[in-house]
Amino acid sequence: MSQNGDDMNKAMMVDGNAAGGMLYDVFSAEMTASPTECAHCGRHEQIGELLAFVHAPGIILRCPACENVLMRVVKTGEFTYVDARGAVYLRIAK
């Protein structure tokens, strides 16, 4: 991707709090304060501190340190797909 494309993508990212509503719908819990760990660089963050790309069919959450994709969430008419393979763990409160 070109430098201009990278800059535009970064300009469209917001903090992970923007994903809070969709994550609540998926997990039935407040997720923005939930801790996670990046599988690439090992950084520990709360979901609300991640970078969120919300201008897509779903959301993409990235590590603010290395920009590794920690989680993708896509809702379709029938299903919700969650891919969290970029996270070592995601802790969900009871």
Tell what function each PLM region has.
Residues 15-28, 43-49:
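Short Cys/His-rich Zn2+-coordinating modules
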